[in-house]
Amino acid sequence: MRFSQTLIPTLKEEPSEAQVISHKLMLRAGLIRQLGAGIYTWLPMGLKVLRKVETIVRQEMDRAGAQEVLMPSIQPAELWEESGRWKMYGKELLRITDRHNRSFCYGPTHEEVISDLVRREIHSYKQLPANFYQIQTKFRDEVRPRFGIMRGREFLMKDAYSFDIDEAALDKSYRLMFEAYNKIFNRLDLKFRPVEADTGAIGGASSHEFHVLAQSGEDVIASCTHCQYAANLEKAFGIAVDLDGGVPEAMVRVATPGQKSIEEVAAFLKMDKARTVKCLTWHDPEADQWYLLLLRGDHTLNEVKACNATAPLAQIPAPEKAVEALGVAVGYLGAVGAEKFNKPVKILADSALRDVTNMVCGANEEGYHLTGVNWQRDLPKPEFVDLRNVEEGDGCPRCGPGSMELSRGIEVGHVFKLGYKYSEAMGVKVLDEDGKEKPLIMGCYGIGVSRIVAAAIEQNHDENGIIWPLAIAPFEVEVVVMNPNESDAMEKAEEITAQLQAGQLEVLLDDRDERAGSKFKDADLLGAPYRVLVGGRAFKEGVCEVKNRRSGVVEKIPVESVVETLLQWLAQEKKA
């Protein structure tokens, strides 16, 4: 492949619209160009990377026994009405009406379509287990598409769906997919972590996310320093550092004028904010049920856990709404005396508060707090549930010696045990061994194929550009001719390129009549694992300069040994 004959529109300046490094580098390296909000055209270099990711995903799905299909992007509304998601999914679902006034959607997922296919084609337990996958363009109408390919509206996804006769069989299918995902990300040569996750809007029982580790990641991952336990922050549980107990003190009403925040109250009373109680109002609008959520003052609320403990649509209400509904004093809210609120409230306390003594909480009176508050004596012990975000240094819930540490990741894969959610709603049944109809139990397994490209860049770059992992590099070697007008150097560069290609390597030959410095910058930007420089003083001395893009090390290799040396190096890297 010749640079001069390929569309690689590199940019010297950082695009002003790009916020994250992957978006900046994908634009600068000429991998993509934006067509509309969250919609991108993949140019030749970007498409080569995308296809390599796709190939690895396809190979491992095939090895795991999944069967490839291709389902329509446009889906009839009737299927989504059957599952109940037509109304539930919200504005992210792009809805379409055809000339006959029939409603459709552009599929963000394909649970309904695959369920319809299976109920039509699979009728007996003898046809199980069944696992179908596709690699296809999806569309989600994100309200604020950003970060380039990372959070676009149109994206390439691998989605798979398994159907089994019972939970034991689903466990096997789930394990096969879990292992296949580990193999995929290992082959992609990315640092990643599978973590336990909340099932979210798709629903279901068990769930794991696969995260590419990167400081720029949107998601926070909590993992144990000693064992394999890891979970998304939405799901993670940690054992809070215990507070020293103590003899219960008398409850005292203390004036705290103007002290409303946890930090202000703790400083004013000269005490550890861990002994203060954060009391939050929480409201379920569907049932008009009010809650008080209690946490240690040094902890933060996990809203996903709070919804799981109360209601899916519950949320923190606006302060003025809480004041109007409950008659409470903002900044001085407390659980003692909650029975006197204007409306009944249910109290839930985070598990970390279970054994805390001599707490401080609001007195439900402007300018006052209560100190020395203790369970049972001053207020009944409420229901204790996990409501908080894990903190760095918490104890591991799975092993004794481990502690939790927090890192950032980019979600690129997700596996779910869906259960009977769709099969029961849509009548996906087979005859079992006894000739009785039985609903199938489902799993679903997604990988963001295009997102992996952006995540790989977020993890593998430096100030000069991309550093591609070998498995997905658009080419393994870039041969740079310092001056294409020097016939000897040009002929040798073409010879080296041809010999490397004969050794089954993909090579980019930079034969442009450009300044050498500009070519070097483009080579670093494009990120090929190795760069071979042909020309200049080194070439006259009978050597080529070979640069390892990741380490930055430059070695002078005799011209006649360049091909053999590179073939050996790359063979060793591929084995590793």
UniProtKB/Swiss-Prot annotation:
Enzyme class at the top of the EC tree:
ligase
UniProt keywords (A-Z) are:
Aminoacyl-tRNA synthetase, ATP-binding, Cytoplasm, Ligase, Nucleotide-binding, Protein biosynthesis
Q: PROSITE patterns in the record, alphabetically? A: AA_TRNA_LIGASE_II
Q: Name one GO biological process term.
A: prolyl-tRNA aminoacylation
Give the EC number: 6.1.1.15
GO MF terms here are: aminoacyl-tRNA deacylase activity; ATP binding; proline-tRNA ligase activity
Q: Which InterPro entries match?
A: aa-tRNA-synt_IIb, aa-tRNA-synth_II, aa-tRNA-synth_II/BPL/LPL, Anticodon-bd, Anticodon-bd_dom_sf, Pro-tRNA-ligase_IIa, Pro-tRNA-synth_IIa_bac-type, Pro-tRNA-Synthase_IIa_type1
| Gene3D superfamilies membership | Anticodon-binding domain, Bira Bifunctional Protein, Domain 2
**What is catalyzed by this enzyme?**
tRNA(Pro) + L-proline + ATP = L-prolyl-tRNA(Pro) + AMP + diphosphate
Cellular location of this protein? Cytoplasm
Q: What is its main location?
A: cytoplasm
Task: Give the coiled coil ranges.
Answer: none
Q: Which cysteines are joined by disulfide bonds?
A: none
Superkingdom = Bacteria
SUPFAM superfamilies, per the entry: Class II aaRS ABD-related (SSF52954), Class II aaRS and biotin synthetases (SSF55681), YbaK/ProRS associated domain (SSF55826)
- Cellular compartments per GO CC: cytosol
* Record NCBIfam families: PRK09194.1, proS_fam_II
Family the entry assigns: Belongs to the class-II aminoacyl-tRNA synthetase family. ProS type 1 subfamily.
Question: What's its job?
Answer: Catalyzes the attachment of proline to tRNA(Pro) in a two-step reaction: proline is first activated by ATP to form Pro-AMP and then transferred to the acceptor end of tRNA(Pro). As ProRS can inadvertently accommodate and process non-cognate amino acids such as alanine and cysteine, to avoid such errors it has two additional distinct editing activities against alanine. One activity is designated as 'pretransfer' editing and involves the tRNA(Pro)-independent hydrolysis of activated Ala-AMP.
User: According to its record, what is known about the domains?
Assistant: Consists of three domains: the N-terminal catalytic domain, the editing domain and the C-terminal anticodon-binding domain.
Quaternary context: Homodimer.
Know the name of this protein? Proline--tRNA ligase
The species this protein belongs to is Magnetococcus marinus (strain ATCC BAA-1437 / JCM 17883 / MC-1)
